[in-house]
Curated annotation (Swiss-Prot):
Descriptive protein name: Putative glycine cleavage system H protein, mitochondrial
Protein family (similarity comment): Belongs to the GcvH family.
Modified residues (Phosphoserine): 131
Gene name as annotated: gcv3
UniProt-listed SUPFAM superfamilies: Single hybrid motif (SSF51230)
Cofactor dependence: (R)-lipoate
Co-factor binding details: Binds 1 lipoyl cofactor covalently.
Domain of life, source organism: Eukaryota
Function field: The glycine cleavage system (glycine decarboxylase complex) catalyzes the degradation of glycine. The H protein shuttles the methylamine group of glycine from the P protein to the T protein.
Name of a matching Pfam family: GCV_H
PROSITE patterns hit by this protein: BIOTINYL_LIPOYL (PS50968)
HAMAP family from the UniProt entry: GcvH
């Protein structure tokens, strides 16, 4: 089992303070009006302060690590995936990402049941480095408590969080 996540242990902030790339701002796509409709709210990407993301389509969320985290980790060489049909809660460990620099646990941003995993990461873990928020997704989770999404960050809030985190180091 991995000790403490690199993201939670302070490795990420110390690394990002020496490698200022503005990556977080790139990860935060422009959004439409902040007037939230139920459809928009449940179909956008949400972020955690531990640098995971979830993009919801209906009642299934696709989960991965953010571009900010992938940039800090560097070249990913191994990805530990969760078992399909596993029931998870917010904050549960659902896998790990190992790079040439460090290893980091991946935590579930939502509660539910893992419905599928990105099996292509077994042969191509570098997808997490090159396309962390598209081809490098970790798993899909059928949501059991969609209201949990309200406690996550939207694009703009996540970008601000990353900017503040960079400034504090």
């Amino acid at each position: 089992m991995l000790a403490r996540s690199a993201l939670r242990s302070g490795f990420l902030p110390s690394l990002t303070s020496s490698v200022k790339t503005g990556f977080c701002l790139k990860a935060a796509a422009p959004t439409l009006s902040m007037k939230w409709s139920a459809v928009k709210y449940y179909s956008t990407k949400h972020f955690t302060k531990e640098h995971e993301w979830v993009k919801v389509d209906g009642d299934v969320g696709t989960v991965g690590i953010t571009s900010y985290a992938a940039n800090a980790l560097g070249e990913v060489v191994f990805v530990e995936l969760p078992e399909p049909e596993t029931t998870v809660s917010v904050g549960d460990g659902i896998g790990a990402v190992e790079s040439v620099k460090s290893a980091s646990d991946v935590y579930s941003p939502v509660s539910g049941t893992v419905t599928s995993i990105n099996e292509s990461l077994g042969d191509s873990p570098d997808k997490v480095s090159s396309s962390p928020e598209e081809e490098g997704w970790i798993c899909k989770i059928k949501l059991s408590s969609p209201d949990e999404l309200k406690s996550l960050l939207n694009d703009e809030s996540y970008a601000q969080f990353c900017k503040e985190e960079d400034a504090s180091h």
